[in-house]
Swiss-Prot record:
Residues 1-20, 223-243, 310-412 are annotated as: Disordered. The lineage of its organism: Eukaryota, Fungi, Dikarya, Ascomycota, Taphrinomycotina. It comes from Schizosaccharomyces pombe (strain 972 / ATCC 24843) (Fission yeast). One of its GO terms (cellular component) is cytosol. Residues 361-379 have a biased composition (Gly residues). Residues 1-17, 340-355, 403-412 have a biased composition (Polar residues). This is Uncharacterized protein C12G12.07c. Residues 390-402 have a biased composition (Low complexity).
Amino acid sequence: MPSQGNNKNSENITQNPIEGELGSVIVEHLTKRIRNFTKKKQKILKLEEIAASDSNSLNDDQRKALQGKDAVLTTLNELKELLSQIDATRIRDEKHKRQFEATENAKRKEEIEAQYREGYDTAQKQVSSLVRFLRFASHNCVHPSDDAPFNSAVEKLLVIVYEGTEKSEKAVADLNDSSTDVVPESEVSFQTISSRVDNFFAAPLPSEQAEELIEDDYAEQPEQAVGQPIEQQSISDDEARQTNRPLNRGIQFLNESEIEGQHVEEPALPSETSVPANSTLQVPTENVEVDVLGKDGTNIYPTQNQVVEQKQMQQKLDSMSPEWYQAADPSNGVVDGTPKLNSNTRGSSKRPSVNRSQGSGQRGRGGRGFYRGGRGRGGFFNRSKRGQYSNSNNSTSQPSPNAELSNFNPVA
């Protein structure tokens, strides 16, 4: 019982702020009284020192003050003791107050958590009911039942849910609570729809029964003839069953090697071959370009068209010979396969022996650019000396071994 009394006192102190203010006033008054009596005590101690040295020097008031020493000390001690008790009581009350606040906070926290769990569970149930109803409504739209009023009620409830208003929230709450109220503009109650939704999700096919149905479906498929494409077996809406296994609808991607039966071989293109991988492939010679040098130093091109094109290209290159290339001197021959050069030829050893492709727009004097010649002096083309080099099948115009190139006299 004393503990209950202490709890009541702590609750009273906590709930009544006036007592806290009154306690502060009392403590302030006691502190002031203790300070005054402490001064009186110090004054009496000084008078005692004076009386000990010279007792005749004290007057009547001082002697009366010395006579009231005991009363002053007694009152001072009582005030100090009272103040200490008040301080202890205040400390105890503050401790009880903190404990009481902690207890109240814990209770309040538990209540809030309980309310949160309750609200969360309620909201989760409503969301679950809504999702399950949407799944059932989609299935019922594709595979309607034989009950026309029920189908109409499901569609109307679905329209109400899609509105997203307070009416929709109330409809979802009634569906979650399995209310006996009727769906607006229908004769079916929320309880009936909720029970049908529960039955829709409460009866999945067992695994053994599902395997038997799969085996039956494969057994009922007709045999396909050899070479005929595989046809997908369609299932009507009346034969659709609620199952988690995939239906025999969709696209099957098969490699050609995975399809059984005979296959008609496509004719090979001219540049292709249909020889098996384990045999030797014989490539026709007319489809291959042979890059082999012949005895005369020219490349061999099997096809006639390529030879004609090469000759035309060589003629175009020879027609663009620059001015500083001069004809060979017939008097000088070839020594050991190397043409002899005239000693008077200036810079002939530095001249390239291969014609450079120059365009008709690069005419003029020196340098590069529009209407300018190639490297060296003078870019004017000498078109009258087209027979300077022999035409060969080689793509690079090399001088003929029989040509006499001794007189390469550059034009000043």
